[in-house]
Amino acid sequence: MTRSDTRIAWRTGWIAGAVAAAAFLLAAAGTKAQEKPATPWVAPADARAVKSPLKKTPDNLKAGEETFKENCEVCHGPKGDGNGPTAKTLTIKPANFTDAALMSKETDGSLFWKMSKGRGAMPSWEDQLSDTERWQLVMYIKTFSEKKKE
């Protein structure tokens, strides 16, 4: 290899490294721009006032648990603590349903509205799950903070 070849190889390597570093920095900057603090997610007053039409029964809780496992656990985790396998990839972290202070602010109606409408990575479930399935899910989600109190 001649001296000229060595210089060309060195320049090519240096340029490739600089391009890779610039691409990494641009990607990181783009990610940081998306990591704005989440604005509070509050259901409208009329939605908050809605009461569940279902009674808390073992069958409804079991159905809610199954729906949770099939649709929610991947983000909210098996314990409902917001630490599901995909949670670390999300900019806005999933709700921690074991947090009694957080859950005390949520009415049945607000939880139903939030899961129906979705936001960001949280999908809207109103076209995928029936009203009954979503109310059963609300019922089950509330058990996570109740378990923590015990």
Task: List where the protein language model places each region.
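Short glycine/proline- and charge-enriched loop/turn segments
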Residues: 45-51, 89-96
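N-terminal secretory signal peptides that target proteins for export/translocation
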Residues: 1-12
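Short, solvent-exposed mixed-charge patches
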Residues: 148-150
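Bacterial N-terminal signal peptides
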Residues: 16-27
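Extracytoplasmic electron-transfer domains, predominantly the class I c-type cytochrome c fold
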Residues: 90-143
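Electrostatic cytochrome c docking/interface patches
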Residues: 36-67
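Sequence/structural segment immediately N-terminal to covalent heme-attachment motifs in c-type
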Residues: 58-81, 87, 111-117
